[in-house]
Amino acid sequence: MARCLRRFFQLAVPAVLVVLLLASSLTHASATIVAMASDSAVGKNSLAMPGSQDILKDALGKYVAVYADAGGNLSVVWANGDPTQSGAWSSPAKSPTPVAAYRRPAAVFTSPLSMRIIAEGGPAAGDLVDMPVSVSRDLAGNIASISFGSPTVLATSAQYASAISTHDGGIVVTWNSAVAGVSSTVFSFRWTLLTGWTSVSDPLSRTPDTVIKDTANANNIQANIIERPDNFALLVVGNRGERSNDTTLVFNSASYGVLGWAWGAQNLAYETDASRGLSDATDLAWDPVRSVVVATYDISRTSRYGIIQIDAAGSKVHVDTPDLKLTNNEWGVLEVDPSTGDYYLFTMDTPLSPPWGQEYGNVTYTRRSNGVWSATLTLIDAGIDNMGISPLRPSLGTGGDGAREIIYAKGKTAPATLNFVRLNP
């Protein structure tokens, strides 16, 4: 699969890097890169599961990024102006230092003045916590300061959380709990301002739902969740852990009713050719042009990504990439242009078969336009020390649909740097 890298031309300006690039399907595409923070943990610990968000745009147009820092604290930085400008990003606001380092935080706004961060760690290793965050603003709506509340433990023996905002202003979170030799389970919880944390399917229950349970394969499941904005159905898709012999995806969905959601029957072999491990976790995005959920996964032993369009009835259509011109693909996430319906697939080109947990590489992207994928990747960052990608997702009332934007971590040791990227027309 080894292929030569594309030619690129790079210009440096103080604190901001503007990269002008050429690719076979993109003519003079450009990206702006700016450093947001310099105290991050390495990417596999600092950034969330790909289906969640660490970079958000609030209802007032302000950008906020959430990450785990090198000391294990939860950290928040924000930009009240253009996030691509020098000096746009604030100094980090930090949580109190936990007993066990926080990892893989997923952030959700619950109002212009509040957000919640779901993360691993806190009181003990293996805990999953809900950290409330207060957002102070000036009269112009600019963020003035961030303050952290006290964390609440949602679960123990938990990992790989995915959290989303829902149409009713609430939150739904999923996570995995794997018991060696016994089972691997994906659970779910729902939060609303009125009820706090309850079952997704029963607002009177404080017991999490069992979304997926596999008693034949007790390896990790890295699952992500999304809500359809048309019928409010929830979809959960996940891949297997790195030590699994299975190359299957797992799936479940929940229909929305008067009192909440009702989970359907799980599918432990939704696809049968998926790569394993965190760096190949599935990604979920909404395509408003076609009214489909788009599930992205790395096809095992290839340089291709499986791209599945899932309609409201649950039917799926594959629009997979061709073999991409890279050595090895990791950390794939997909964004949809809500105006054109074009797909932008961000991935990292890493050395062949990197050790588990060492999937560092070049940041790249390719595009599906007018129904056709380009096999040639456009280079964003040629450093081989990058790990993890978190995309900006459009959310109801919170913007995020004007440009394709991501953040990623740069550095093989902590402290690492977090970079913000905007693709420009």
Describe these PLM feature segments.
Residues 29-425:
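Extracellular, repeat-based ectodomains that mediate carbohydrate processing or recognition
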Residues 12-24:
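Bacterial N-terminal signal peptides
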Residues 1-7:
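N-terminal secretory signal peptides that target proteins for export/translocation
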